[in-house]
From Swiss-Prot:
Glycosylation sites (chain numbering): N170
Region (Disordered): 161-224
Keywords, alphabetical: Disulfide bond, Fusion of virus membrane with host cell membrane, Fusion of virus membrane with host membrane, Glycoprotein, Host cell membrane, Host Golgi apparatus, Host membrane, Membrane, Signal, Viral envelope protein, Viral penetration into host cytoplasm, Virion, Virus entry into host cell
This protein's encoding gene: gL
GO cellular component: host cell Golgi apparatus; host cell plasma membrane; membrane; viral envelope; virion membrane
Region span, Interaction with gH: 20-161
GO biological process: fusion of virus membrane with host plasma membrane; symbiont entry into host cell
Protein name: Envelope glycoprotein L
Primary localization: virion
Post-translational modification, as annotated: N-glycosylated, O-glycosylated, and sialylated.
Length: 224
């Protein structure tokens, strides 16, 4: 699968949900970025506490063919990954672990090398990104998401929040937004509660009416 195909599967919103308690919702759909410096000056996204879940949402609309830059912020604790559309002047924060997994797969594709120099460069890039990902194992969990959990869920605790939408409730939180208030979405912290997980149960087998029960066929007697 090509890199754009992998990018198409990556979610670009971040939801922070503290299971069972009121918490704050952080969504990073996009940010105004007229030039590279607008991206580089954004602070790193801080790692959540151990009991805090992060979920990424798919954007409503984005043309991946128009992406002009991909930024892997090596100095950030979570390896912040940003896609930049120069024409639209927007930057999208994406799930770094899903993105890097697809990127490394593309780099290791045997059909890529065209010459010795390209092969050496590609292998060096693969090694560098692989080391960056391995050094951040504490920031991600590779445990598969159980059935009934939200798709593309990245969570250190792998808490299953079900398929219900997270609705706002009254509450406060001491955390601050992960992006400055000039984010184009104008996002403000919203208290959330985690809905109970959806547990799939099978319906009991309906009882068959006595009148519909199959009758045993009696053998016919034959006269000799």
């Amino acid at each position: 699968m090509g890199i754009l195909g992998w990018v198409g599967l990556i979610a670009v919103g971040v939801l922070c949900v503290r299971g069972g308690l009121s918490s704050t919702e952080y969504v990073i759909r996009s940010r105004v970025a007229r030039e590279v410096g607008d991206i580089l000056k954004v602070p790193c996204v801080p790692l959540p506490s151990d009991d805090l879940d992060w979920r990424y949402e798919t954007p409503s609309a984005i043309n991946y063919a128009l992406i002009d830059g991909i930024f892997l912020r090596y100095h950030c604790p979570g390896l912040d990954t940003v896609l930049w559309d120069r024409h639209a002047q927007k930057a999208y924060w994406v799930n770094p672990f899903l993105f890097v997994a697809g990127f490394l797969e593309d780099l290791s594709h045997p059909a890529f090398p065209a010459n010795t120099q390209e092969t050496e460069t590609r292998l060096a890039l693969y090694k560098e990104i692989r080391q960056a990902l391995d050094s951040r194992k504490q920031a991600a969990s590779h445990t598969p998401v159980k059935a009934g959990c939200v798709n593309f869920d990245y969570s250190r605790t792998r808490r299953c929040v079900g398929r219900q939408d997270l609705g706002p409730t009254n509450g406060t939180s001491g955390r601050t937004p992960v992006l400055p208030p000039d984010d184009e979405a104008g996002l403000q912290p919203k208290p959330l509660t985690t809905p109970p997980p959806i547990i799939a149960t099978s319906d009991p087998t309906p009882r068959r009416d006595a009148a519909t029960k199959s009758r045993r066929r009696r053998p016919h007697s034959r006269r000799l």
